[in-house]
Amino acid sequence: MRKRKISVCQQTWALLCKNFLKKWRMKRESLMEWLNSLLLLLCLYIYPHSHQVNDFSSLLTMDLGRVDTFNESRFSVVYTPVTNTTQQIMNKVASTPFLAGKEVLGLPDEESIKEFTANYPEEIVRVTFTNTYSYHLKFLLGHGMPAKKEHKDHTAHCYETNEDVYCEVSVFWKEGFVALQAAINAAIIEITTNHSVMEELMSVTGKNMKMHSFIGQSGVITDLYLFSCIISFSSFIYYASVNVTRERKRMKALMTMMGLRDSAFWLSWGLLYAGFIFIMALFLALVIRSTQFIILSGFMVVFSLFLLYGLSLVALAFLMSILVKKSFLTGLVVFLLTVFWGCLGFTSLYRHLPASLEWILSLLSPFAFMLGMAQLLHLDYDLNSNAFPHPSDGSNLIVATNFMLAFDTCLYLALAIYFEKILPNEYGHRRPPLFFLKSSFWSQTQKTDHVALEDEMDADPSFHDSFEQAPPEFQGKEAIRIRNVTKEYKGKPDKIEALKDLVFDIYEGQITAILGHSGAGKSTLLNILSGLSVPTKGSVTIYNNKLSEMADLENLSKLTGVCPQSNVQFDFLTVRENLRLFAKIKGILPQEVDKEIQRVLLELEMKNIQDVLAQNLSGGQKRKLTFGIAILGDPQIFLLDEPTAGLDPFSRHQVWNLLKERKTDRVILFSTQFMDEADILADRKVFLSQGKLKCAGSSLFLKKKWGIGYHLSLQLNEICVEENITSLVKQHIPDAKLSAKSEGKLIYTLPLERTNKFPELYKDLDSYPDLGIENYGVSMTTLNEVFLKLEGKSTINESDIAILGEVQAEKADDTERLVEMEQVLSSLNKMRKTIGGVALWRQQICAIARVRLLKLKHERKALLALLLILMAGFCPLLVEYTMVKIYQNSYTWELSPHLYFLAPGQQPHDPLTQLLIINKTGASIDDFIQSVEHQNIALEVDAFGTRNGTDDPSYNGAITVCCNEKNYSFSLACNAKRLNCFPVLMDIVSNGLLGMVKPSVHIRTERSTFLENGQDNPIGFLAYIMFWLVLTSSCPPYIAMSSIDDYKNRARSQLRISGLSPSAYWFGQALVDVSLYFLVFVFIYLMSYISNFEDMLLTIIHIIQIPCAVGYSFSLIFMTYVISFIFRKGRKNSGIWSFCFYVVTVFSVAGFAFSIFESDIPFIFTFLIPPATMIGCLFLSSHLLFSSLFSEERMDVQPFLVFLIPFLHFIIFLFTLRCLEWKFGKKSMRKDPFFRISPRSSDVCQNPEEPEGEDEDVQMERVRTANALNSTNFDEKPVIIASCLRKEYAGKRKGCFSKRKNKIATRNVSFCVRKGEVLGLLGHNGAGKSTSIKVITGDTKPTAGQVLLKGSGGGDALEFLGYCPQENALWPNLTVRQHLEVYAAVKGLRKGDAEVAITRLVDALKLQDQLKSPVKTLSEGIKRKLCFVLSILGNPSVVLLDEPSTGMDPEGQQQMWQAIRATFRNTERGALLTTHYMAEAEAVCDRVAIMVSGRLRCIGSIQHLKSKFGKDYLLEMKVKNLAQVEPLHAEILRLFPQAARQERYSSLMVYKLPVEDVQPLAQAFFKLEKVKQSFDLEEYSLSQSTLEQVFLELSKEQELGDFEEDFDPSVKWKLLPQEEP
């Protein structure tokens, strides 16, 4: 074990390098990340071209003159309601000079005013009286008063023009608003008090106060710019959120288990994105300073603000990655929070918020950032330089904002760390909410050695007869002690107990296997032992370290190597880089990292793939890499969860050898689904069932207690008589049973306790050659049978035991079940009649349409994108409607004094001030002052008139009172920043005069605006349709690219093999896609007509557009199909194609707009650009509509031909699709009735390579294949004939000028599969199995040779194959029943027959409970069952099974094997099966063929291959007295001189005996019986080589030179070393 030292710095650096490599190698993601940011930066850079910053110099007082000098009256006055009082008031108003000659009209209500206004040619001012003293003045928008309510502190309120200075505050004065207000106020006062003040109010003068210099931003552009600043880091933050969430979910818990510190994980991502933020903040500060958006504040101020804001967003992304589990949602949530909180920050720009509220809201970093930006704008406005913050100018607020952003960053990080601790991860690991209050969290004291409790010492269940006691030498070596461990998960409705009170020990120096069915709790137990999961109750100690203590867990991480069930690697790193990363995470010393990596690469034979990216590795290579990561650092404890899953036998044996070499002084615990792996590798097996401990012990113990016995396999010739052999066997062993028989083969079960009878039996078998026995072998009961017996299930033996119909099961109900399965499956042979021709074509179309519709229901992203596109079409309508409602409802702003002036006793606060009144009468004006004070206004009075109110802009307004003979005269001075100042001061003066006479009432004036009514437009709705059509032209990629998914999950290939016609596939898709797309058009037209119902003019053109829309739908959908077919091997990229369609359409619209009166150009555009066809038709139709409306000429019929263009496009794309299918599509199984594509027979090419040095069995098979090929008797022909197959692939060039070298996958392979036969095709990765399967299915065309399937040369045509691929070619969201019904329809079964067949198959394979379950919710075993059922559905004569039982537990494998045997036994069908699992081949195959380096190395029955190529027998003995071990070893070497001791575990001794030492078998058993009696053996077993051993022996011949490195990195083998005695 290598010394480890966990270093946060080393881990951080390793993870940081990993993150940089990810960014470099995932160029698409990195490009999008930076491109989005840079595009936003570019938008900010071009800002000066569309925005004007007002740098306004100081301005002296502006004199506006008397209010009655307004004489440019362009409006008439309408008022309501009409009463005596209002009539008197408005008559007085009408007598004013500026309304001379203008009409003042009274109308009864608002509706009457609207009707009058709509037909009146001049501008109208509406006066609406609420009561005598309150009224609304409503001016037309843009006339008489500004449209905005108020100026903001950062916006410009005055502008320099060529001739003069324009201030918006003067609009009220110059456009007549104040004049009309003064006239109405004077009339009200005169009518209600009989006191005329018309002269006083008409003589009021106005002035703008002196203005200081300012720099003002203005308009919506400023807000858009600020919004762009808010989202300036969004691209980085989105990808940071996605990456961190994804890595936390998939890898962090596993890396933590290896010793990763949390701080290293967060630092690695934080430092990476801090660097990105630093660069982006630098660019942003440069752009903002160069564009003069922020003028006076220094570069460092802007840079620090953006830098801290970006860092806070990174911290926020980390926090959300913990609270939100899905990566996409995390990025979306962070973006929405940024936008929402940032937009909330606009309130700081437009409102003066209380300081306490600003501090609280600044805990939201986007708000704090916007607060900082608002402060910078305000500083610019006030001309305060802010190169460096200084308290004297108020810029210390920027320092406070920066502090809050830094505080937010720390707060978000602290919350992220806290929530990560207390929220359970996917394994349920969590800490209590107040964990930080415990002293153990802050100081980890040295722990004391754990002392086993008394109940722990006595709790081991070894005393039970189902548990073998540990050998004496292991007493005291209990490394892992499991006591009363229970694990519960929350379920619906009850809790699920994964483990139930487990109690057992695991010993140092032993390899222990955890066995059990799927869901037994194996992975859960290993997760608990590795620290990933926490038990609900119970305790676990590992080398006296308690898993419940965090300090102990950290210590154990240095001792443990874990290989979880899922592969652990980063796909964007190479094999070496993955190993280096995890070596550093594990704390291997830096100087030893390279040496350790080199060791692992050599031991696992991965040197040749060390520079291959993990994403390019095969499944087996990824598994080997995960195992390599587990053994890094030579750990003392190995916890391996199915470490050899997906490995070929050669690689499995590599792993076994490595574990055997390391077991001394180490603890090795692994789980597996392969019973043979546990049998060979593990010293001790622990069986779990339903979470409970079932039994534990060595193989010999378990086989003796639950095994069936020995299996005697006899290979027979033609003269054999079964009854004679059975009689002979029973003569020696009466309780022997004939367990299975097949053509040329008998298998008997011999009880274990009858081994003393074996010598005489074998002697007689050798002595009677006339019995017809060619050879025989004996094998011990398998651990698989033990497992199934423990589970209470029946089994078929791995040497062909329990061939259905001949099974002698131990239980009657098992026998009935097996026979029933055979009857059910064989009954399907009668259902051979299927429909064909056009009827089948229509049925297939409906089936594919159903699939498309079901898939569409679950394509949420595509539907969401479609919905967003349609919603975008509502934007113009929505904006227009909103704006109309805003102004139709007329913003009403009361001109109250409290807009600008303080109330008495109110604390001063911005922007309110006191009202300054200057007395220049030379006398007392107390009566007026008292009247103004009565309006609840705080006054500052200059009683002596010494001040000039116009020179002091610190006040919002000032009133200067002068004396003019008998009356007062007034001069109003307003601060130019206060937009409504003049109307407010006019009301104050008016109420002051009214109060002097009648103090109990006040006049209230409100200002409003209204919109001018538009005129009807007979073709207005076309604009909306046009906008919608531009958007909907981008919809097809989201609707019609489903075929790419079908291609990638191989569903399309599976459908083709099942007999689907290419045209049926595309028309089935189109049936749904075109309908959906046409519904989009219907929706568009309906919404256009509804929203413009009053403006709609329905003509013949609009009716003709309906079939045009139908043709356009077909055209664009089939155009998308063509694109999907061409780019089927790449990514779907719906968004990119949608954008392309959109851009093309937009440019086409521009072309139409500029050439609408050129008749040829729009027609050419419409014809050449399919996405723009509908737009072109609409343009041309609108042009014809104009002609029909404004011309008396009859419309020409010729332009209507343009509506046929979409149908022409559809025909062109359909023909293109047909050509693509014919040229590049795979071999069709049936003749396509529409595309007219017939099944193509490949041209037979002579194989250039003559076979050399072939095995005699392979030569015989080649002759048999040639004879079958030339046979004219189709009834006797095999169902599969593969003759002289050769397949070459084009290799890659190693250099620009190097010659391309072809890679040969198969070399002159010939074999045939007879009726009723299952032929197993075995071989390592790269041996040529998959290529052979692809040639048979038609996926690959052979370079030479030919394949004939039953009926392809005559007789009944083979219309479909049965194919169970290695990858589950299933649709994730469809249920099991839906899959079965679709494939039944594709294969041509009538509905009634399909229902019967589905019911029978479901019952036979026990799939009733899963019928309504979506495939994505099924276990791997159920998916494999479904694939098998789909392959045999429709009773195909040829079935190809590629790893059919992969991923199944032993029980599921047995069910699958039974189904395979029942399906093909005594039928007209045949099957070709490929597998890595030798037990599967032994269980179901009549013959097996082993491929080596693309050639057939051998072929024949299993027993024949064992006898021919098997070199060893395995001898196991268990002694009672350990003192007998050495004498026994000497005796074995004397009896069997070439015996090689394999292992010795205390009382268990294992030897490998060469065949020549064992023959004759009778003599070998005779010797062993003597040994048993002489040495008082407890038990012994002698069994023949397994098929796996034969396979490995033959596989030594696969050499390195057969393939180049760049063809398939998995094909790297070396000669296995010979076993030494």
Curated annotation (Swiss-Prot):
Residues binding ATP 1, per UniProt: 516-523
A GO biological-process term: transmembrane transport
Annotated compartments: Cell membrane; Basolateral cell membrane
Molecular function as annotated in GO: ABC-type transporter activity; ABC-type xenobiotic transporter activity; ATP binding; ATP hydrolysis activity; ATPase-coupled transmembrane transporter activity; lipid transporter activity
Membrane topology term: Multi-pass membrane protein
PROSITE patterns named among the record's database cross-references: ABC_TRANSPORTER_1, ABC_TRANSPORTER_2
GO cellular component, one term: basolateral plasma membrane
Enzyme class, spelled out: translocase
Intrachain disulfide bonds: none
Keyword line: ATP-binding, Cell membrane, Glycoprotein, Lipid transport, Membrane, Nucleotide-binding, Repeat, Translocase, Transmembrane, Transmembrane helix, Transport
Entry's EC annotation: 7.6.2.-
Family the entry assigns: Belongs to the ABC transporter superfamily. ABCA family.
Protein name: ABC-type organic anion transporter ABCA8
Organismal lineage: Eukaryota, Metazoa, Chordata, Craniata, Vertebrata
